Amino acid sequence: MIDFRPFYQQIATTNLSDWLETLPCQLKEWETQTHGDYAKWSKIVDFLPNLHADEIDLKSAVKSDRTSPLSEGEKQRIIHHLKQLMPWRKGPYHLFGIHVDCEWRSDFKWDRVLPHLSPLQGRTILDVGCGSGYHMWRMVGEGAKMVVGIDPTELFLCQFEAVRKLLNNDRRANLIPLGIEQMQPLAAFDTVFSMGVLYHRKSPLDHLSQLKNQLVKGGELVLETLVVDGDINTVLVPADRYAKMKNVYFIPSVATLINWLEKVGFTNVRCVDVATTTLEEQRKTDWLENESLIDFLDPNDHSKTIEGYQAPKRAVILANK
């Protein structure tokens, strides 16, 4: 099982120390209610070898390697373990010559977001809905002091810990398996990311308020979410599914999204990027047995989802507390 005590020790002398009032009890409770496969997944992490990487690149990729390459047998054993943690959704990872080609080219998103951010050097960062942690490692690569990701999905936690193990057990990033609604308001993070989460929230304004409560005064919010074309009065509420996803509730226009952020008290709200999701960015690979974007679009008109809605388009909004 994954041990969170090193994280408790890390934050004990930081401005996150107040979290220790609630977090250990929450995670003890979490351990009693985990997914039935969690024990198996965490053992897979244990089975991975303790390799020392001579080269780690988190600035331009998430990559580890060493001067003496692994044998083919060693590579195949690691691939076998990692594939037991499928599906791998967000990546890619390059680990000791093994290319973990995930469903999403999350480096594409990072390249869109990064140029607009306040420098991450020395910052304490929260990544809400972090998945398996790809962007967390890229934040570390930009010089973040500490990156905390939260995501309640046990598989993502085990994928994150597997990658960490193959990155010399780097402790600058940590994944906590909780949702933001379970976090006490810490007002302790310099930057808070919420990417690909808002449209899954039944109450989007509550989510925005929860993000604000985690920021220091003047801190920066990085919000990336699905949007639709339209004016300040435009919000899509899918009747049933959107792109085959049943847990999509509100997809606003950029103007509506900016209005929401201002309504909950954010300042300096600005849209810095809008991009339609491409079949190069989200696609099937050998590391994903499920359907992907091509299956979610109208086969005769890729400008629409299979349900007839506008195809996925994502905006990046920055704001300050």
Curated annotation (Swiss-Prot):
Name one molecular function that GO assigns to this entry.
Answer: transferase activity, transferring alkyl or aryl (other than methyl) groups
Q: Which reaction does it catalyse?
A: carboxy-S-adenosyl-L-methionine + 5-hydroxyuridine(34) in tRNA = 5-carboxymethoxyuridine(34) in tRNA + S-adenosyl-L-homocysteine + H(+)
**Matches recorded under InterPro entries:** CmoB, Mo5U34_MeTrfas-like, SAM-dependent_MTases_sf
Q: Does the keyword section mention Transferase?
A: yes
Report any one BP term from Gene Ontology.
tRNA wobble uridine modification
Q: Where are the transmembrane segments?
A: none
EC number(s) in its UniProt entry? 2.5.1.-
- Identify the keywords attached in UniProt to this record, alphabetized: Transferase, tRNA processing
Q: Which family does it belong to?
A: Belongs to the class I-like SAM-binding methyltransferase superfamily. CmoB family.
Question: Main role?
Answer: Catalyzes carboxymethyl transfer from carboxy-S-adenosyl-L-methionine (Cx-SAM) to 5-hydroxyuridine (ho5U) to form 5-carboxymethoxyuridine (cmo5U) at position 34 in tRNAs.
Q: How does it assemble?
A: Homotetramer.
Protein name, per record: tRNA U34 carboxymethyltransferase
Native organism is Haemophilus influenzae (strain ATCC 51907 / DSM 11121 / KW20 / Rd)
Q: Which gene encodes it?
A: cmoB
